[in-house]
C-alpha cells in the first residue's frame, strides 16, 4: 500500500520477538484505510491481513491471543487494532515459508525483530523468505514496549494489577493497580531465562542481573521428571500436586519454626530435599514433582528479585514474560513471597500483555528503518 506521508512505514506493520522458546508477534491492522488506499492495495497485502485477522489459530501451534487485542488505537498517525500472536520458535521456518508463499518480500516491508532469534535465524529469513531483518536490542524493546502498552488504554481495562491479601489464599484476589507514574520500577522478565532491569525513566534503565533458571528450566525439568509434553500440561500437573512431598521444609529439620532467624516452619529449607529418601521417592507423584519444580523456580526468581529491589532501593517489582502466561499459581507465589519476606515493603505487580512487550517495542522501531 502506498502511503502519501513518506514518514510512515509501508504496511504491513509487524514487530517480532524471537525468543529461545516462543516467537511473539505484534501486528497492527489499520482500520482507517481510505477508498484510494484500498484501490491501490495489492492482493498479497490483503491476503496477509485477512489471514492474520480472520483466524485465531495458525497451523497446529500458532495462536492469536484475541483477549489481548488492543482496539482502535493510534500508532504513527494511523488508527487500527493491535493483534498479538505466538508460536514455538522451533516452528519459525514454517512461518518464514508462509511469508514466502504469501509473497511477503514483494511488499518491500521492513521487518523489525528482537530477541536472540533475530540473530540466530537472520540467514533463514534471507535465504528462505527473501526478507531482511532489522535487529533491535531486546532489553530496549522490552522497556519501550512495556511503557507504551501501559500508556494506552487496554480497551477500558487496567493493564497493571496485583494480588491483594497475598498471604491469605482464601482471600487473595486480583486487583487493578495504577501505574501512571511508573518510576522507579524493577522489571523481572521471565522467559526461558530471567533478566532483571532497574528502570528510572524511559531513557534511563540498566540490566541489574539475571539467572539461567527460568521458564525453560521449569519446562525442561518437568519434561524430564514427569514426561509432560507442553507448558500447559506441566502447569496442569503442578496445580494438582503438593510440593512438600518433594521439598524438605524448615519444620522437617527443626520440628517447627527457626525463631532466632525468623524462619517459619513452612518455609522451604531444601528444594527436592526429601528425594534423597527411597521411601519418599516411591510415594511422590508426578504432580508433586511438577509442583515442586514450579515452586523451586518461582521461589528462586522471587528471592533474586527481592535482593535486587533492596539493593536498588525500588519498592515496586513488575513481573513479565511468557512464564507467567496462564500461570496464576506462580504469580500468587511471587506476590506472597515478596509481601512476606519484605514485611509488606515490596509489591509484586503484573501486566496483562506479559509476554508481548519485546514484540511491541520492535514494532515501535519501524519508523527508524522506513
UniProtKB/Swiss-Prot annotation:
Intracellular or extracellular location(s): Cytoplasm
Any single Gene Ontology cellular-component annotation: cytosol
Cross-referenced CDD domains: ASKHA_NBD_PanK-II_Pank3
EC number(s) stated in the UniProt entry for this protein: 2.7.1.33
GO molecular function, one term: vitamin binding
Record's keyword terms, sorted: ATP-binding, Coenzyme A biosynthesis, Cytoplasm, Kinase, Nucleotide-binding, Transferase
Active site (UniProt): 138
TM region(s), chain numbering: none
A Pfam family assignment: Fumble
Highest taxon, organism lineage: Eukaryota
Activity modulation comment: Subject to allosteric regulation, exists in two distinct conformational states, a catalytically incompetent (or open) conformation stabilized by the binding of acetyl(acyl)-CoA, and a catalytically competent (or closed) conformation stabilized by ATP-binding. Inhibited by acetyl-CoA and its thioesters which act as allosteric inhibitors and compete with the ATP-binding site.
GO BP annotation list: coenzyme A biosynthetic process; phosphorylation
Binding-site residues, acetyl-CoA: 192, 195, 207
Catalytic reactions on record: (R)-pantothenate + ATP = (R)-4'-phosphopantothenate + ADP + H(+)
Associated pathway: Cofactor biosynthesis; coenzyme A biosynthesis; CoA from (R)-pantothenate: step 1/5
Main location: cytoplasm
Function: Catalyzes the phosphorylation of pantothenate to generate 4'-phosphopantothenate in the first and rate-determining step of coenzyme A (CoA) synthesis.
Complex and partners: Homodimer.
Similarity section: Belongs to the type II pantothenate kinase family.
Alphabetical list of NCBIfam families matching this protein: panK_eukar (TIGR00555)
Protein name as it appears in the record: Pantothenate kinase 3
Gene name of the encoded protein: PANK3
Amino acid at each position: 500500500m502506498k502511503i502519501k506521508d513518506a514518514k510512515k512505514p509501508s504496511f504491513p506493520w509487524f514487530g517480532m520477538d524471537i525468543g529461545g522458546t516462543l516467537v511473539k508477534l505484534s501486528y497492527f491492522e489499520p482500520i482507517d484505510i481510505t477508498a484510494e488506499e484500498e484501490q491501490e492495495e495489492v492482493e498479497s497485502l490483503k491476503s496477509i491481513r485477512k489471514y492474520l485477522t480472520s483466524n485465531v489459530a495458525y497451523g497446529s501451534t500458532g495462536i492469536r491471543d484475541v483477549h489481548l487485542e488492543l482496539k482502535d488505537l493510534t500508532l504513527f498517525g494511523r488508527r487500527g487494532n493491535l493483534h498479538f500472536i505466538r508460536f514455538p520458535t522451533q516452528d519459525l521456518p514454517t512461518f518464514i515459508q508462509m511469508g514466502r508463499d504469501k509473497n511477503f518480500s514483494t511488499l518491500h516491508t521492513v521487518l523489525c525483530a528482537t530477541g536472540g532469534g533475530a540473530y540466530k535465524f537472520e540467514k533463514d529469513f534471507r535465504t528462505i523468505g527473501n526478507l531482511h531483518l532489522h535487529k533491535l536490542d531486546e532489553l530496549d524493546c522490552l522497556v519501550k514496549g512495556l511503557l507504551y502498552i501501559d500508556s494506552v488504554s487496554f480497551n477500558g481495562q487496567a493493564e497493571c494489577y496485583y494480588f491483594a491479601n497475598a498471604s491469605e489464599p482464601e482471600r487473595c484476589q486480583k486487583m487493578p493497580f495504577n501505574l501512571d507514574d511508573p518510576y522507579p520500577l524493577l522489571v523481572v522478565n521471565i522467559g526461558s531465562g530471567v533478566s532483571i532491569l532497574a528502570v528510572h525513566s524511559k531513557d534511563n534503565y540498566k540490566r541489574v542481573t539475571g539467572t539461567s533458571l527460568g521458564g525453560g528450566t521449569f519446562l525442561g525439568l518437568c519434561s524430564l521428571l514427569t514426561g509432560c509434553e507442553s507448558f500447559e500440561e506441566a502447569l496442569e500437573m503442578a496445580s494438582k500436586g503438593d510440593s512438600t512431598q518433594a521439598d524438605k521444609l524448615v519444620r522437617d529439620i527443626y520440628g517447627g519454626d527457626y525463631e532466632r532467624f525468623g524462619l517459619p516452619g513452612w518455609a522451604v529449607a531444601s528444594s527436592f530435599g526429601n528425594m534423597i529418601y527411597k521411601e519418599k521417592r516411591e510415594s511422590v507423584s508426578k504432580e508433586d514433582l511438577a509442583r515442586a519444580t514450579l515452586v523451586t523456580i518461582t521461589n528462586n526468581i522471587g528471592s533474586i528479585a527481592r535482593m535486587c529491589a533492596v539493593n536498588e532501593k525500588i519498592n515496586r517489582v513488575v513481573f513479565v514474560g511468557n512464564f507467567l502466561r496462564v500461570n496464576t499459581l506462580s504469580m500468587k507465589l511471587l506476590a506472597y513471597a515478596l509481601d512476606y519476606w519484605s514485611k509488606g515493603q515490596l509489591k509484586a505487580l503484573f501486566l496483562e500483555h506479559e509476554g508481548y512487550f519485546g514484540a511491541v517495542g520492535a514494532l515501535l522501531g519501524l519508523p527508524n528503518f522506513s
